[in-house]
From Swiss-Prot:
Pathway the protein takes part in: Phospholipid metabolism; phosphatidylethanolamine biosynthesis; phosphatidylethanolamine from CDP-diacylglycerol: step 2/2
Pfam families named in the record: PS_Dcarbxylase
Keyword Secreted: no
Main localization category: membrane
Cofactor note: Binds 1 pyruvoyl group covalently per subunit.
Summary of the function given for this chain in its UniProt record: Catalyzes the formation of phosphatidylethanolamine (PtdEtn) from phosphatidylserine (PtdSer).
Cofactor(s) this protein cannot do without: pyruvate
Molecular function terms from GO: phosphatidylserine decarboxylase activity
Protein name, UniProt field: Phosphatidylserine decarboxylase proenzyme
Lineage: Bacteria, Bacillati, Bacillota, Bacilli, Bacillales
Catalytic activity: a 1,2-diacyl-sn-glycero-3-phospho-L-serine + H(+) = a 1,2-diacyl-sn-glycero-3-phosphoethanolamine + CO2
Site note Cleavage (non-hydrolytic), residues: 225-226
Any GO BP: phosphatidylethanolamine biosynthetic process
Amino acid sequence: MRKWLYRLFIELTNHSLSSKLLASFAKSRLSGLLISSYAKIYHINQDEMEKSLKNYKTLQQLFVRRLKAGVRPVDADEHTVVSPVDAVIEDMGTIRENCEMIVKGKPYSIAEMLGSVEAAQPYVNGFFFILYLSPSHYHRIHSPISGVIEKQWALGRKSYPVNRLGLKYGRRPLEKNYRLITEVTAGGKRLAIVKIGAMFVNSIELTHEGEQLVKGEEMAYFSFGSTVVLLFERGSFAPDPRIVAPMPIKVGERLGYWCEAHER
């Protein structure tokens, strides 16, 4: 019953008109009246922000704020993989033979997420992370490794909540939501960075130019809280034993080790 009521509410409120209205409001000067309250409610760390709160004129500007230089140091070990976002690690684990990952006890198909069995095949028996960004988090996305962008594509249209309730009761949001997928190679292995849109707001903006990525370098931003899924090819990654789910993590902090370092 709870699942049915949750889905009914989401379907009744999640349509193109409400999405456009919310996006328009967030970009309007009127939304600026809510900035102070928003910062207090979500406990935004103003000491880290590039600008003072009074310099943000709309909620949209606050959502996509940049941070001061140096407040997110990137793990210096050249063999490490770092978090691309400030987030909560909601889940992590091994991708099964049938292309499924288990998130909050619920199976999700990476073939659906990536758009085909062919695209998913390299990640079978690999590793995954689910990184959830709440409205309070810094919304910019950075590269978790240094490598080369091999392919980039978008899937999905609508977006549903990707918070804990969404993962538990929703209609498979990690597979169905609007998502922008970036596939990166390094040392002959690949990593998929799946940026998933949040309810109402599908906007995922790319900021990186060129094919070469440097670990810790900005590559995109969300216009609202959302989720990043990392998919590692089999044999390419070893998680840091200190990492557990759920736990908070910040941009540049170590998630684990790329294959070449682990093999040594």
